[in-house]
């Protein structure tokens, strides 16, 4: 291979003779300038000084800071969840927030994060200047066409902004002067299969996990007509993609570095703009077969050999100086004798010591941003429910600015209101360490016509069939309006259930307005009771339906309070042998983790539901892990006769998972009311102040791949009780199931 330096020398001499040829020559002469960078800059410390910012963003600053913190929290090489979250709290304290100051404050306190002023530069169109045998490339948008007579190439990486499209522009530049693909370094990054549960130590049975492994990068594709020698011009600060490009090419011995050394930490970072400032967040460690690459990639020449000093960026080396230097062949391997001090990302674990209960405006703001960032990365249903989380975040932050947060219940309510926009029936928020209720309103409520109606009660003077019309003088319609605005749910029935549950917690005696089945409203003062009234809508045990006039039919209640094990299920199913029909009650919550009960109810091979989990391979590559299986039936005992499935608005999650398979196999007739439309393993997010937020972490589809979320199990036959039915203890859904099994209608 010809000496690139001799070619550069020839080109510079040619350029000097032809200065009158115009602006292109002047540009080349200027861009060949450089500064001398001493060996003292080869330290890996203060890598922030060597990064180039990118443009700002159109996103509101809180949304952008949420994204930056999400990168740090879930992909960064710095501290774990809790320490990064506390840095965010510190940055967001006060009566209001200066988002630029908060960005700097946050970056100062988090390892692997740098705050920089955003740049106004954008990625311009690619430029190719030809000076004799030298092609000078300024990467940018559009194709790169290298003149046929070119014998060497200079690619200028200086002052390129960390703007969208830069990585692709650089790939086009090297591709245009290569006939063979150029290998790229792998990057050790954190992988996420769903969002790891932050409350429970991970086990082999965990649905979600994270781990750290190398991620291979595709080589730079070759599109050129000739393999040309390449020199890269580097400045004191580079955009992350430009630094990555330089490290890739120099480690592959594909290019020389001229100008300033390249700090590998910059190449391992990602630009995250916030407002007038932004952050470089380091998310990887670059590696090859020998391990981590050096912290600093030294230049092959600082150009001081050519008579240039610091600050002489407009100077041009003399032709004599260039001719005196000859680098032939390919660059020598980069020296790797200096120990690498850059850390790699580490696996994230659940916290061993939980955050203490605390409240402040900074905690509330930080928790809102943390929850927003986590759902942005891991909530799977935006395509189904719509994406309103940015506007909801701004709405909640405005409330914090308006009313300072002084107790944990305020933070909890803000987070509940945020979660409401997800329309997710698992969207709960718990305040650890908050005040304990004085007791409970010990009734079991059902929803009839949009009103809470008592199904069971152990409270004196409160009876089944009573409709709750008010609480402490607040009309129930008004009370429910406030609470449903803080209740996340995918279907109306479950939304009412989530809101109405909050009637149960009592801080002291309360007066309830109650409308009896006779239409008369009375007011009853209720004392808090020591226990809640829990359980499924019905506690009826498995057995014959002879007491309801159908001795030929059998009933099985799968609620965990009634049938708590697979062994009990087998015994109940054996007792049902010979029945002409079976009523399967899934209005409660089952306790079966295996597919065995379904295998004994479906006599032919069947498909499971489709489980789709979000997967991040480092911070850039998103995909899905999808699982669906075919299951074989089991016998002895089993049941192959007609089955009616009972569901209702409290049929949620595991109840629905059981039901999805039965309905997907077309094994049952469904009677009752629509279920909650919420299934999938919960992701649990632990935040400062002792806040624990839940959301569904995987997408669930029916076995035929149709949408489940927000649809739920829809009855073939609608059946809704009345207040009179509840007062009489009449199970109308069960009676309707019996009617169908006996008449087929």
Task: Give the positions of each predicted feature.
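Flexible, low-complexity junctional segments that flank or bridge functional domains
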Residues: 38-240, 244-592, 596-599, 603-612, ...
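A hydrophobic, small-residue-rich beta->alpha segment in the mid-to-C-terminal subdomain
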Residues: 712-724
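Flexible, gly/ser-rich surface segments that form the specificity/activation loops bordering the active-site cleft
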Residues: 676, 680
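Alpha-helix C-terminal capping segments
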Residues: 663-665
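Flexible, glycine-rich surface segments
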Residues: 242-245, 632, 642, 646, ...
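N-terminal secretory signal peptides that target proteins for export/translocation
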Residues: 1-20
């Amino acid at each position: 291979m010809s000496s690139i330096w001799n070619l550069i020398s020839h080109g510079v001499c040619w350029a000097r003779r032809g200065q009158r040829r115009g602006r292109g020559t002047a540009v080349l002469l200027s861009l060949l300038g450089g500064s001398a960078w001493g060996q003292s800059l080869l330290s890996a410390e203060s890598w922030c000084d060597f990064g180039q910012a990118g443009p700002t963003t159109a996103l509101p600053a809180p949304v952008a800071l949420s994204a930056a913190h999400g990168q740090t929290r879930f992909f960064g090489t710095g501290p774990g969840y809790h320490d990064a979250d506390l840095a965010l709290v510190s940055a967001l304290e006060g009566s209001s927030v200066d988002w630029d100051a908060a960005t700097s404050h946050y970056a100062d306190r988090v390892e692997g994060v740098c705050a920089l002023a955003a740049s106004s530069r954008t990625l311009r169109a690619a430029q190719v200047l030809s000076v004799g045998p030298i092609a000078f490339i300024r990467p940018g948008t559009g194709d790169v066409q290298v003149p046929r007579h070119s014998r060497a190439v200079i690619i200028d990486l200086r002052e390129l902004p960390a703007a969208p499209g830069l990585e692709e522009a650089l790939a086009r530049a090297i591709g245009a002067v290569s006939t063979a693909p150029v290998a790229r370094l792998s990057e050790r990054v954190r992988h996420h299969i769903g969002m790891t549960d932050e409350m429970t130590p991970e086990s082999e049975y965990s649905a979600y996990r994270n781990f750290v492994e190398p991620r291979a990068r595709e080589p730079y594709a070759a599109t050129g007509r000739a393999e040309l020698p390449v020199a890269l011009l580097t400045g004191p600060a580079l955009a992350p993609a430009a630094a990555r490009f330089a490290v890739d090419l120099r480690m592959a011995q594909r290019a020389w570095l001229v100008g300033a050394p390249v700090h590998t930490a910059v190449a391992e970072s990602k630009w995250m703009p916030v407002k007038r400032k932004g952050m470089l967040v380091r998310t990887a460690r670059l590696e090859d077969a020998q391990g981590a690459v050096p912290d600093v990639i030294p230049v092959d020449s600082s150009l001081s050999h050519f008579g240039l000093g610091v600050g002489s960026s407009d100077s041009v080396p003399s032709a004599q100086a260039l001719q005196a230097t000859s680098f032939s062949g390919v660059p020598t391997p980069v020296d790797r004798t200096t120990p690498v001090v850059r850390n790699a990302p580490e696996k994230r674990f659940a916290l061993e010591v939980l955050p203490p209960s605390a409240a402040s405006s900074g905690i509330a703001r930080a928790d809102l941003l943390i929850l927003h960032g986590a759902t942005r990365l891991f909530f799977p249903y935006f395509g189904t429910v719509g994406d309103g989380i940015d506007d909801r975040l701004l709405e909640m932050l405005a409330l914090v600015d308006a009313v300072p947060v002084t107790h944990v219940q305020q933070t909890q309510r803000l987070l509940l209101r945020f979660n409401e926009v997800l329309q997710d029936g698992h969207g709960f928020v718990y305040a650890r360490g908050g005040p304990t209720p004085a007791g409970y309103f010990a009734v079991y409520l059902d929803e009839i016509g949009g009103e809470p109606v008592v199904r069971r009660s152990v409270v004196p003077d409160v009876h089944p069939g009573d409709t709750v019309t008010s609480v402490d003088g607040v009309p129930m319609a008004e009370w429910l309006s406030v609470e449903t605005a803080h209740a996340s749910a995918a279907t109306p029935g479950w939304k009412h259930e989530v809101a109405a549950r909050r009637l149960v917690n009592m801080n002291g005696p309360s007066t309830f307005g109650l409308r009896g089945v006779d239409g008369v409203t009375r007011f009853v003062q209720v004392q808090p009771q020591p226990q809640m009234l829990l359980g499924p809508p019905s506690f009826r045990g498995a057995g014959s339906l002879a007491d309801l006039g159908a001795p030929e039919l059998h009933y099985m209640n799968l609620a965990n309070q009634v049938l708590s094990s697979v062994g009990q299920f087998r015994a109940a199913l054996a007792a049902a042998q010979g029945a002409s029909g079976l009523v399967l009650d899934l209005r409660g919550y089952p306790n079966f983790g295996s597919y065995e009960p379904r295998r004994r109810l479906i006599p032919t091979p069947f498909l499971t539901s489709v489980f789709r989990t979000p997967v991040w391979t480092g911070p850039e590559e998103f995909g899905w892990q999808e699982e669906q299986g075919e299951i074989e039936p089991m016998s002895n005992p089993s049941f192959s006769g007609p089955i009616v499935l009972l569901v209702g608005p409290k049929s949620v999650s595991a109840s629905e998972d059981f039901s999805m398979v039965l309905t997907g196999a077309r094994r049952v007739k469904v009677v009752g009311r629509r279920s909650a439309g919420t299934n999938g393993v919960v992701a649990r997010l632990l935040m400062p102040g002792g806040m624990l937020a839940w959301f569904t972490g995987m997408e669930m589809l029916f076995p035929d791949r149709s949408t489940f979320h927000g649809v739920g199990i829809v009855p073939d036959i609608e059946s809704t009780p009345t207040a009179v039915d509840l007062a009489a203890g009449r199970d109308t859904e069960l009676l309707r199931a019996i009617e169908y099994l006996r008449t087929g209608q």
